[in-house]
Amino acid sequence: MSDRTEQVATSDIPRPTQNLRTRVVSYFPGLAVAVLIAISAQFLSEHYGAPATLMALLLGMSLNFLSESGARTVPGIHFASRAVLRFGVALLGARVSLEVLSDLGVSLLCLVTTALACTILFAIIVGKFAGMDWRLSLLTGGAVAICGASAAVALNAVLPPRQNSDRDLALTIVAITLLSTSAMVLYPVLASHLQFDAKESGVFIGGTIHDVAQVVGAGFAMSEETGQIATLVKIVRVSLLAPTIIAVLIMVTVLGAGAGQKPQKLGQVIPGFVLGFAFLAALKSMGFLPAAAGDVANDLSRWLLLIALGAVGLKTSVKEFASIRPSHVTLALLATAFLAAFIVVGLLWYRG
């Protein structure tokens, strides 16, 4: 085979040995498309109230043809869906502070923490009975239990690669976003029906709704006190993203990611973005991260994740969704219902 033939047969993704200028030129078209999708998604979110993450995915999926083999945009799309995503996840650490845990109280903190762990375990068990890949079940359970799209992106980045992982991530985010939007409308009504007081309503809203913005919307729609408590509880759930990622990472590296994969030493395989996440979380928790720097990191993380999700959408074909089994969406719905029921029962028991 000639050098020319070999060159044509290689991947659209640039080799690591290529110089920086060649990489930048190669990445630019696809990366520019992903950035434009993120800007458009944010515009739709600000002017029409649509969830930005969902808009980024749907806009990307509508332009899926740009990720077809041979297109000039392929290298940049791949870069955005991997490298940009991981950098955005690392910056999520600036949102995590262990200080908020002490403000909630031991009993309610135990309730929220136990609900998170049990929801993930519930999703894995139900997924196993439904014949689903355990990684997809864990991804779905983690997204429901912790913080929606951000948790899904972070967990997907540390889970072992699998076929159609980008498609599964996209579908998970779509399902979680729609469920969270429904919960924002229905859960305040349910809290009132159960005669929860402001504190109980705040714990219920913050402990069950997936997306941060929707927690804030539902909480403050009930009352100022409920909104503040709901936001605090949601921050606690976000804070638990770090130990969850570490636990998953230990599981897939020390115990082995699956059949045929040998266990590895944890120190050999911890991704740099996980270390960055942990480092920023530690700085935030110890008070060493200035508020201004934290705000910049939060904003940058949000934009990077929007860009990455736009790229994930670009790599996801609408036709592929036809091959999705209903069990995936059903699992997200069941996990959401389980989390809500767990928190309700816990609050009723806590009440006395």
Curated annotation (Swiss-Prot):
Pfam family, one: Cons_hypoth698
The keyword Transmembrane helix appears for this protein: yes
One Gene Ontology cellular component: plasma membrane
TM stretches of this protein: 24-43, 48-67, 104-126, 136-158, 169-191, 201-223, 235-257, 272-294, 301-318, 328-350
Keywords: Cell membrane, Membrane, Plasmid, Transmembrane, Transmembrane helix
Topology versus the membrane: Multi-pass membrane protein
Keyword Cytoplasm in annotation: no
Cell compartment(s), UniProt: Cell membrane
Entry-linked InterPro entries: UPF0324_pro (IPR018383)
PANTHER family: INNER MEMBRANE PROTEIN YEIH-RELATED, UPF0324 INNER MEMBRANE PROTEIN YEIH
Family: Belongs to the UPF0324 family.
Protein name: UPF0324 membrane protein RA0957
Originating organism: Rhizobium meliloti (strain 1021) (Ensifer meliloti)
